[in-house]
């Protein structure tokens, strides 16, 4: 049997209210796709039964895997372990893909694969779908990447602060994910940052299509990016940030200037996000955690990496001046209104 072109992994936890919409959009890819539905120990609704229903109805496309609750990261790990597709993409069960864009992307991947030029990383746009005001906002990369051709890290432009690669925008070759040795932490939110970040040094070729493929649903009260939820779960954000500090030696990338620069940019963003949500907490314990995070960065990176982050974008949220915290939170509120990221 021919290898599947792509594996979609859909971690599901009590997702019965919305997962069908997600799955139906993935089924539009037909037999060239493998869909792995990972039931993460759901007990409150019909998620396990829905996974089994689709696996029975589409036995050549859908696999249902039931696991003890391990969190979103273990759902992604489970997908990687079981994937047979050339490419691997995670789709959260409350999100979906645009079907027309998906067909276009897969047609291009088929063409590139037939030519023997399949890239390590395929990149597309993603769209924030805001439920609270029925608006949308597209994140695209036309200023960063060449379009509709193969390229490498030497060809990329400058990322704006609101323009990082996220899980929503990437399709990795499955082998790249295995080669980098990535294993996401269990019972931890925000591990999608590790998923995007850790494999980057293993990516040698890329392809960008200016298509709005991924639809990122935002606005559920219990969503992990909801501000109040993030404040409560800030320890998990800190755990992920420390993991990212440790998982790659950025000094080993000095010969790849643009790749190193982007990874510094991403790590700076993670430090800034951690700082902001600790500031929103506002407690003495949170201030101690903030100081400990910066001390961890200093102890686990070179002086050059630390200085780049501390005195660059990441350090903007850790101002050692009077009323620095108020200035940071004021800037955060302005950015929140402009970009509506949570």
Predicted regions and their residues:
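A conserved acidic beta->alpha catalytic loop
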Residues: 39-49
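Short aromatic/hydrophobic "clamp" motif used to bind/position activated sugar donors
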Residues: 88
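N-proximal low-complexity "stem/linker" segments adjacent to membrane-targeting elements
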Residues: 1-25
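Membrane-interface aromatic/basic loop that binds lipid-linked glycans or pyrophosphate carriers
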Residues: 279-342
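Donor-binding/catalytic cores of nucleotide-activated saccharide
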Residues: 72, 95-206, 214, 218-230
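Short, acidic, metal-binding catalytic loop of nucleotide-sugar glycosyltransferases
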Residues: 24-33
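Glycine-rich, basic loop-to-helix element that forms the pyrophosphate-binding segment
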Residues: 67-83
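Catalytic core of nucleotide-sugar-dependent glycosyltransferases
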Residues: 211-220, 226-254, 269-303
């Amino acid at each position: 049997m021919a290898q599947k072109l792509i594996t979609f992994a859909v971690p599901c936890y009590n997702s019965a209210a919305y997962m069908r919409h997600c799955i139906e959009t993935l089924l539009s890819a037909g037999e060239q796709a493998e869909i792995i539905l990972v039931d993460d120990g759901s007990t409150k609704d019909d998620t396990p039964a829905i996974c089994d229903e689709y696996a029975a109805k589409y036995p050549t496309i859908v696999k249902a895997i039931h696991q003890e609750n391990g969190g979103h990261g273990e759902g992604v790990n489970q997908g990687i372990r079981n994937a047979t597709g050339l490419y691997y993409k995670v789709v959260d069960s409350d999100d979906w893909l645009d079907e027309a864009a998906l067909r276009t992307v897969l047609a291009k991947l088929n063409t590139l694969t037939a030519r023997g030029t399949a890239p390590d990383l395929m990149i597309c746009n993603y769209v924030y779908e805001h439920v609270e005001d029925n608006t949308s906002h597209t994140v695209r990369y036309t200023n960063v990447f060449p379009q509709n051709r193969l390229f490498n890290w030497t060809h990329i432009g400058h990322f704006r602060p609101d323009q990082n690669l996220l899980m929503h925008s990437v399709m990795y070759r499955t082998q790249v994910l295995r080669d980098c040795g990535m294993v996401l932490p269990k019972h931890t939110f925000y591990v999608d940052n590790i998923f995007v970040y850790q494999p980057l040094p293993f990516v040698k070729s890329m392809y960008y299509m200016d298509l709005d493929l991924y639809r990122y649903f935002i606005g559920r009260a219990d969503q992990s990016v909801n501000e109040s939820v993030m404040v409560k779960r800030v320890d998990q954000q800190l755990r992920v940030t420390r993991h990212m500090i440790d998982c790659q030696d950025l000094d080993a990338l000095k010969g790849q200037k643009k790749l190193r620069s982007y990874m510094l940019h991403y790590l700076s963003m993670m430090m800034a996000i951690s700082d902001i949500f600790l500031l929103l907490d506002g407690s003495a314990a949170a201030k101690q955690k903030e100081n400990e995070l910066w001390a961890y960065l200093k102890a686990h990176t070179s002086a050059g990496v630390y200085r780049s982050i501390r005195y660059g974008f990441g350090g903007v949220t850790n101002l050692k001046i009077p009323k620095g915290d108020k200035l940071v939170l004021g800037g955060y509120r302005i950015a929140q209104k402009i970009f509506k990221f949570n």
